[in-house]
A protein has these predicted regions:
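Structural preference for solvent-exposed beta-strand-turn elements
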Residues: 1-167
């Protein structure tokens, strides 16, 4: 795997996707960000099994491939990168992150241990709906105050989503 992109694009996507990664996962693979490069597209996936966040963005793909890296360490490296172009290269059991001024080598996790069900979920099924982030945020602000922050009554700790008349 080898690809080029700008630090601005990948920083934003990594910071978004890493929010879904659990700090104390049940399996080591769930502490990672799954990176898949295919035909000038990068797909980042992060999950704690309850929540899956994926980000897709265009890259200059040199060699397609996939890998799994520790989310916390990878996010920290992304924050430290100077602006400009960045090149990611798969070198054995490491991934090399290289800019004009810096170079990092991060140990990879075994991407084959990442739960395949998280990677194969369909985005546009008959049961899925798309809505604007602002609409979702406004709706959650209105009803989120009714959800209990404590686990004493587990049925009251979430927000119920329902789709009526395609709205």
């Amino acid at each position: 795997m080898k690809f080029k992109t700008t630090t601005k694009v990948i920083k934003e996507c990594v910071l978004t996707v890493s929010k879904a990664v659990d700090t104390r996962p049940s399996t080591p693979a769930l502490q990672g960000l799954y990176i898949k490069i295919k035909e000038n597209n990068c797909e980042l996936t992060g999950s704690d099994l309850d929540l899956v966040i994926k980000a897709n963005f265009e890259v200059e793909s040199i060699v397609d491939g996939e890998c799994l890296v520790n989310s916390r360490i990878f996010s920290e490296v992304m924050r430290k990168l100077p602006s400009g172009e960045v090149v990611f290269s798969d070198i054995g059991n490491e991934i090399k992150v290289e800019t004009k001024k810096t170079e990092y080598r991060l140990r990879k996790l075994d991407h084959l241990t990442y739960p395949k069900t998280l990677l194969e979920q369909q985005h546009n099924t008959s049961e899925s709906k798309q809505l604007k982030t602002t609409s979702l945020f406004e709706a959650l602000k209105k009803v989120g105050v009714a959800a209990s922050p404590e686990g004493g009554k587990p049925i009251l700790t979430g927000v119920f989503f329902d789709n009526e008349n395609n709205q």
